[in-house]
Amino acid sequence: MLRYSLQARSALRGVRFSSSHSAPKPGSTIPFYINKKPLPTLLYFGTFGVIFSIPFIVVKYHNRNL
């Protein structure tokens, strides 16, 4: 178990270092990030944002009606 977690951590560290070494120029950061992160993860975080924003919208609506 411990060995597996250490291997996973070293693999993550290697990925992080490799991505930081191939950093793009400041002008091309946005397309680089869009190409780097696949669309499903963006949709996943978008749905998370919607789910988190629903309670705030409901609270605002109720406060306006009171």
Curated annotation (Swiss-Prot):
A Pfam family hit: COX7C
One GO MF term attached to the UniProt entry: oxidoreductase activity
Topology class, membrane: Single-pass membrane protein
Stretches of the chain found on the membrane's Mitochondrial intermembrane side: 60-66
SUPFAM superfamilies: Mitochondrial cytochrome c oxidase subunit VIIc (aka VIIIa)
Membrane-side (Mitochondrial matrix) residue stretches: 18-38
Subcellular location(s) of the protein: Mitochondrion inner membrane
Claim: Oxidoreductase is one of the keywords in the record: yes
Keyword Membrane: yes
Subunit details: Component of the cytochrome c oxidase (complex IV, CIV), a multisubunit enzyme composed of a catalytic core of 3 subunits and several supernumerary subunits. The complex exists as a monomer or a dimer and forms supercomplexes (SCs) in the inner mitochondrial membrane with ubiquinol-cytochrome c oxidoreductase (cytochrome b-c1 complex, complex III, CIII).
Family per record: Belongs to the cytochrome c oxidase VIIc family.
Free-text function comment from the UniProt entry: Component of the cytochrome c oxidase, the last enzyme in the mitochondrial electron transport chain which drives oxidative phosphorylation. The respiratory chain contains 3 multisubunit complexes succinate dehydrogenase (complex II, CII), ubiquinol-cytochrome c oxidoreductase (cytochrome b-c1 complex, complex III, CIII) and cytochrome c oxidase (complex IV, CIV), that cooperate to transfer electrons derived from NADH and succinate to molecular oxygen, creating an electrochemical gradient over the inner membrane that drives transmembrane transport and the ATP synthase.
Protein name: Cytochrome c oxidase polypeptide VIII, mitochondrial
Source species: Schizosaccharomyces pombe (strain 972 / ATCC 24843) (Fission yeast)
Organism ancestry: Eukaryota, Fungi, Dikarya, Ascomycota, Taphrinomycotina
Gene: cox8
